[in-house]
Amino acid sequence: MRKPRGGKDGLVKHQPGAPVRMKDIARDMGLSTVTISKVLRGHSDISEETRKRVLKRMEELHYQPNLAARALITGRTSTIGLVVPDLLHPFFAQIAKAVSAGIRGQGYSLIITSSEEDPDLERQEIEQLLARRVDVMLIASAQWSVESFRRIEERGIPYILIDRFFVGLASNFVGVDDEAVGMIATNHLIDQGCLEIAHIRGPETSTALGRLEGYKRALAARRLAPMPKHIVSIGSSGDDRGEPGGYEATKKLLGAKPRPDGIFCFNDPIALGAMRAILDAGLRIPEDIAVVGCGNLLYSDFLRVPLTSVDQDSEAIGKFAADLALSLVAAKTPPPPTSLMVSPKLMIRASSMRN
């Protein structure tokens, strides 16, 4: 090992006020700049002892990597782009938090944008991320077609679809088994004695289609026929996607004959609107109508009627997406597309407990 050189503290003297450079760290510790660089990039051929020593010394000297210079040398920006349809939705916020935690320790930063469920805005955000030369993109897409993803592929940027996929598009995907979500929720309502089960479905995405299919399969398996008037769609933009959409959809269902005695909602915000409509109509939850949502949002336990919900494990989705993104960056050649499915879990609360 090289002997440390420099001033009394071992650090090579440099102009006062100037930032500490990688080669200063290397000379200070008697290591090569290649070793320091490998530590910064998380290379596996560096021992854990050396990695900890280097990182500790960097922290002591307040070393900040020159990301622009590194990008010119490596062709990488150490950034990952995340496009979600709704920044305020807790499900996507929790995914973003888990992704950020998963990549932070490897020296990567997360750039988050929102499409507001607008395909045109999503395309603009993707173009902005391409212009920023992110190393990987994670996308919970609002698109109706795969054209935007062809554009990403042409640029040679790896991407991962989160929560929503496209049939016929060979891509990386991390999400929940949405058909299982629909089956778990519907079977639970049947087990609670519900026979007229309605479904408030989401917009035309793989997520909504999967949950609708699971709802239908669960009914068919128990020899119950889904009634068209018991399947109500919410709007695809604006407030229609959340509580207001759930409220209006439930008002329609309350006028149906026969009236539903159980409602499976596409997500928890819709379920909140559904419960408000039921209570405003002077009906009881779950005695008159049982309600199940999806997402298991943090406030579900603290509602006037605690909400039964299917937990999608957003933290696991974010962690898996982060790990997959880092592996795509490290790969010397593009690997075959990977699909990771998280198993949903039912969290039973008062809104559905009739037995």
Q: What are these model-derived regions, one by one?
A:
Residues M1-Q15, E60, A101-Q106, L130, ...:
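Bacterial carbohydrate/catabolite-sensing allosteric modules
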Residues M1-S78, M353-R354:
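N-terminal helix-turn-helix DNA-binding module of bacterial transcription factors
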Residues A26, I139, G262-F266:
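Short beta-strand scaffold positions
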Residues D28, T33-K38, I73-L88, H188, ...:
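Short beta-strand segments enriched in small/hydrophobic residues
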Residues E48, L61-V136, K216, M227:
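Amphipathic helical "hinge" segments at domain boundaries
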Residues E60-N66, D120, A140-A142, Y247, ...:
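Short gly/ser/thr-rich secondary-structure transition/capping motifs
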Residues E116-P119, A140-S145, P269:
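Short beta->alpha connector loops
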Residues V136-S148, L161-S171:
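Acidic, Gly/Pro-rich loop/turn segments at junctions of secondary structure
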